[in-house]
Amino acid sequence: MKILRKNHPLLKIVNHSFIDLPTPSNISSWWNFGSLLGLCLMIQILTGLFLAMHYTSDTTTAFSSVAHICRDVNYGWLIRYLHANGASMFFICLFIHVGRGIYYGSYVLSETWNIGIILFLTTMATAFVGYVLPWGQMSFWGATVITNLLSAIPYIGNTLVEWIWGGFSVDKATLTRFFAFHFILPFIITALALVHLLFLHETGSNNPSGLNSDSDKIPFHPYYTIKDLLGIFLLLLALMILALFFPDILGDPDNFTPANPLNTPAHIKPEWYFLFAYAILRSIPNKLGGVLALILSILILAAFPLLNTSKQHGLIFRPITQTIYWTFIANLLVLTWIGGQPVEYPFTTIGQIASITYFTIIIILMPVSNTIENNIIKL
C-alpha cells in the first residue's frame, strides 16, 4: 500500500518540508526560532483578524473602538494584549534568528538570507503601521515623525509624504490606508516565509559546527517536531505571562491619551524593537544623512555574504570574531537604550559613538578579524 503523505500531490509538499526533511543531527535550540516565528505569525494573524472585526479605522472612533474591544468584547482585552505583546515576542524571535544566522554563518546561503532581509523589512513596516492604529498620542506623533522623514528625499520628498498621508497632515485618510496595509502585509509575510523555506530546503540547513552534514542527517519528524514543541510551549508561556501579568510594560503611557495634533508629547519614540534604528537615525544631525543611516542599519545585513572572507564557516572555532560579535550585540543593546532616552547630553554623544561602532564592526572589524584568523590557520 502506498503511503498517502508520500504520494498525495499536496501532502507530498508538506511531507518533504516538515516530516521526511533531512536535517543535520546536531542543530541546537538556536535553530528553534524559525518555527517560533511561524507560530508568532499565526498568532498575530488570528488575533489581528478578531481585532479587525471590532476595530474602526476612523479618526473619531479608532481610539474608542480599541477601548470598546477591551471593555465590551468577550475576551477582547486578552486578544488585544496577545496581539500587542505577540509583536514584541515576534521581534525577540526575529532578532535571535538573525543573530544566530550571523553567528553560525547562515548568510552564506545567500538566497535564503536575502529573502530573510526582505521579510525583516516587511515585518518592520507591518509593526509600524500597526502601531498607528490605536490612534493614541504616540501612535499619531510616531506616524507624523517617521513618515515625515521621507521629505528628506530630494525633489520628490514633500510630494511623497503628502501622497502617503493622503492630505496635508496625518489624518483620516492616513489611518484608513495604514489599516489596509496592516491587514494585507501579514499575508505577504506568509508568502515570503514560504519562499524563505523553499530556498532553505533547496540547500539544506546549516549546523553549529559549520561542517558539511550530508553524511549525518536525520528526519525532521519526530526528532525536531518534539524539540520545536518545547520551544513553542516556552514561547506561549512567556507570551501569556506578558499578556496577563504585565500587559502594558512594553507600551508607551502616552498611548493611553487620544491623539491630539495640537499637543506634542515630550519625547516621541517608537516601540522598543525599533529603538536601535531610531538611535542611529537621531545620531546624525543631517535629516537625509539620518534617513540613509536608518535604511543602511538594516540593509547592511546584505553585506555579510559579500564581506565574508573566512575559511571557516560560522564563529564556533573563531575566538577573535566571537569577541567582536558579542561586542556588536552589546552595542545593539546600548543603541536600544539610547533610542528611548531624551535628545540631550550625554545620550546624544553615546548614541553617536554606538552608531559609528555599529557600522565599523560590520564593515571593518569583522573582515579584518577574518583575515587575521585565516593567517593564524596558516601558521
Curated annotation (Swiss-Prot):
It is found in: Mitochondrion inner membrane. Keywords: Electron transport, Heme, Iron, Membrane, Metal-binding, Mitochondrion, Mitochondrion inner membrane, Respiratory chain, Transmembrane, Transmembrane helix, Transport, Ubiquinone. CDD domains: cytochrome_b_C, Cytochrome_b_N. Its cofactor is heme b. The keyword Transmembrane helix applies. PROSITE patterns: CYTB_CTER, CYTB_NTER. GO terms for cellular component: mitochondrial inner membrane; respiratory chain complex III. The chain crosses the membrane at residues 33-53, 77-98, 113-133, 178-198, 226-246, 288-308, 320-340, 347-367. Binds 2 heme b groups non-covalently. Heme 1 (or BL or b562) is low-potential and absorbs at about 562 nm, and heme 2 (or BH or b566) is high-potential and absorbs at about 566 nm. Belongs to the cytochrome b family. Component of the ubiquinol-cytochrome c reductase complex (complex III or cytochrome b-c1 complex) that is part of the mitochondrial respiratory chain. The b-c1 complex mediates electron transfer from ubiquinol to cytochrome c. Contributes to the generation of a proton gradient across the mitochondrial membrane that is then used for ATP synthesis. This is Cytochrome b. The gene is MT-CYB.
